[in-house]
């Protein structure tokens, strides 16, 4: 069957029975580029070629691994030694760390220079005239005021007094110290120190008076 007759039959210009399946068996000529012809083995996977290429580039994975350099960061960090925990000296760990500090702080805060303590009660020092008074009631406030007015430091012991009278005497002594520009300090429970304006008693001296016993100052 000619090509022209096939075209006519395709468009209905010729009866269908005039051609058979030969139309489908004939192949039209290729209108594009000529396709390359391949062998029958085209597309067939061959694992040997892949293994050979992989072995050439990375070494035989089925055997011994390739000799790769150790992993590391850029800049030479891999060459630096790894961090190791510090090994402490056992003698250093067992050494008391706060003993000397406590001794020094106690010596500096609570203790006083013995020479300074001796000078406090030498003749001519204002604290050498210190007086301890133990009033029984508020009526003895006059004696406290006179001693303080004369320039003598006064230790006022109110332990034997009831709270009401002790409070009144504390108010009186505080007002007296304020009026004469002195100082009024607590050295122990219900024990107070009245210091004239020309007598400067440091906190260390007040603590020392309370520790050594104010009963010694008569």
Swiss-Prot record:
Oligomer status and interactors: Homodimer. Interacts with FtsZ.
GO biological process, one term: FtsZ-dependent cytokinesis
Biased composition (Basic and acidic residues): 36-65
HAMAP family registered for this protein in UniProt: SepF (MF_01197)
InterPro entries noted in UniProt: Cell_div_SepF (IPR023052), Cell_div_SepF/SepF-rel (IPR007561), SepF-like_sf (IPR038594)
Gene Ontology CC annotation, any one: plasma membrane
Region (Interaction with ftsZ): 115-203
Family as reported in the entry's similarity comment: Belongs to the SepF family.
Entry function: Cell division protein that is part of the divisome complex and is recruited early to the Z-ring. Probably stimulates Z-ring formation, perhaps through the cross-linking of FtsZ protofilaments. Its function overlaps with FtsA.
A Pfam entry, by short name: SepF
Protein's cellular compartments: Cytoplasm
Domain of life: Bacteria
Protein activity control: Inhibited by 1-{4-[2-hydroxy-3-(naphthalen-2-yloxy)propyl]-1,4-diazepan-1-yl}-3-(naphthalen-2-yloxy)propan-2-ol (also known as compound T0349); the binding of this compound blocks its interaction with FtsZ.
Name of the encoding gene: sepF
Protein known as: Cell division protein SepF
Principal location class: cytoplasm
Segments for region (Disordered): 20-81
Keywords: Cell cycle, Cell division, Cytoplasm, Septation
Record carries keyword Cell division: yes
């Amino acid at each position: 069957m000619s090509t022209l007759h096939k075209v006519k039959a395709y468009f209905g210009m010729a009866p269908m029975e005039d051609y058979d399946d030969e139309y489908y068996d004939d192949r039209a000529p290729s209108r594009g580029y000529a396709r390359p012809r391949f062998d029958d083995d085209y597309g067939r996977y061959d694992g040997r070629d892949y293994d050979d290429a992989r072995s050439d580039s990375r070494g035989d994975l089925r055997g011994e691994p390739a000799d790769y350099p150790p992993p590391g960061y850029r800049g030479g960090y891999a060459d630096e030694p790894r961090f190791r925990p510090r090994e402490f000296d056992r003698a250093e760990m067992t050494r008391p760390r706060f003993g000397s500090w406590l001794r020094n702080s106690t010596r500096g805060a609570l203790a006083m220079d013995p020479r300074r303590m001796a000078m406090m009660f030498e003749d001519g020092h204002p604290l050498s005239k210190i007086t301890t008074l133990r009033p029984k009631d508020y009526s003895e406030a006059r004696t406290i005021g006179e001693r303080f007015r004369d320039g003598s430091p006064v230790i006022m012991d109110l332990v034997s007094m009831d709270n009401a009278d002790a409070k009144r005497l504390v108010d009186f002594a505080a007002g007296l110290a304020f009026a004469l520009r002195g100082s009024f300090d607590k050295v122990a429970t219900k024990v107070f120190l009245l210091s004239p304006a020309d007598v400067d008693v440091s906190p260390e001296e007040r603590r020392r008076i309370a520790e050594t016993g104010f009963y010694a100052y008569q």
